[in-house]
Amino acid sequence: MTREVVVVSGVRTAIGTFGGSLKDVAPAELGALVVREALARAQVSGDDVGHVVFGNVIQTEPRDMYLGRVAAVNGGVTINAPALTVNRLCGSGLQAIVSAAQTILLGDTDVAIGGGAESMSRAPYLAPAARWGARMGDAGLVDMMLGALHDPFHRIHMGVTAENVAKEYDISRAQQDEAALESHRRASAAIKAGYFKDQIVPVVSKGRKGDVTFDTDEHVRHDATIDDMTKLRPVFVKENGTVTAGNASGLNDAAAAVVMMERAEAERRGLKPLARLVSYGHAGVDPKAMGIGPVPATKIALERAGLQVSDLDVIEANEAFAAQACAVTKALGLDPAKVNPNGSGISLGHPIGATGALITVKALHELNRVQGRYALVTMCIGGGQGIAAIFERI
């Protein structure tokens, strides 16, 4: 009998901006919070979970080496359930969901959790010479946050890869700025309409005047204008460059998690799933143009699902940069109205290891809100990869 994976709950935190409301909250704590809430919403006991997989990229403290396990146990999952932390860079959160789903498909368990947690605000500085080499004189530090934003093969910033994509796919500065502005418009409208309320679990922390509750995405510029965008100078290529701080994604902090179940088990429990996982796909591309990774990954996922682009109702294609987001939409022939209807990485933010899980939660809630059938979740990955997954509302 063929096994099917359904998502029975999905939650996320609000997304904090760099050095913002979540800068003092460890990613393991954010992970535990979303695990606990996802279990509660799914009406599933932590004793029933057979596997947990979490995405994380930048380790900020010793606990992060075991982030998946810490998030699981502190989130209420039985200590008997194994847990795994995965790093597929920007695709880590979605990879965690795929990997957790695979444990169900393989028959290892009937209940699994996939998610991601990241705190770019807490990224450490590495002192490579501190243990053995710093006997005399000055010693340098390596910014691990910036390290995650550089291509490991060509030692170039991801912004340069976006410039390469812009040139190859003829994406102008004006197109990028307009796309960035539209991202802020959509995110602002979604927040004001309350579209995210049901998917966000508040983060409560101690402040000098008592508890402080963080429950609203804070990276969005609600008053952004096209003039704001056009005034910014290119950051990565000074002469004839097009990528700016305004049309690139943010540096952010957040977490998200989904509870998945074998379909027959969900039916036995009388649960109403958000969606079923239809297919997924991975692909490798030239690292110098990593932003185009969603194109081949999406084609693989569509082929496995037996679907066409026209069948998709909601598309979450992460905006690492407006240049690559526009190129992906162009290359796949996507309907811009269906792509990131409530904003994406530029406006809401891109907490790298968590983003894949975040946009999955966003996609599933939006799919149910608009009563669509199919949703695509896809993203580019530093180092030259792409990942995609397709879900069906049932």
From Swiss-Prot:
InterPro entries: Thiolase (IPR002155), Thiolase-like (IPR016039), Thiolase-like_BktB (IPR053528), Thiolase_acyl_enz_int_AS (IPR020615), Thiolase_AS (IPR020610), Thiolase_C (IPR020617), Thiolase_N (IPR020616). Keywords: Acyltransferase, Transferase. Its EC number is 2.3.1.16, 2.3.1.9. One of its GO terms (molecular function) is acetyl-CoA C-acetyltransferase activity. It comes from the Bacteria. The active site is at C90 (acyl-thioester intermediate), H350 (proton acceptor), C380 (proton acceptor). It is an enzyme of class 2 (transferase). Signal peptide: none annotated. The keyword Transmembrane helix does not apply. Pfam families: Thiolase_C, Thiolase_N. It catalyses: an acyl-CoA + acetyl-CoA = a 3-oxoacyl-CoA + CoA; 2 acetyl-CoA = acetoacetyl-CoA + CoA. Disruption phenotype: Mutants are impaired in their ability to produce PHBV when grown on propionate. The keyword Transferase applies. Belongs to the thiolase-like superfamily. Thiolase family. Required for efficient production of poly(beta-hydroxybutyrate-co-beta-hydroxyvalerate) (PHBV). Catalyzes the condensation of acetyl-CoA and propionyl-CoA to form beta-ketovaleryl-CoA, and the condensation of two acetyl-CoA molecules to form acetoacetyl-CoA. This is Beta-ketothiolase BktB. It comes from Cupriavidus necator (strain ATCC 17699 / DSM 428 / KCTC 22496 / NCIMB 10442 / H16 / Stanier 337) (Ralstonia eutropha). The gene is bktB.
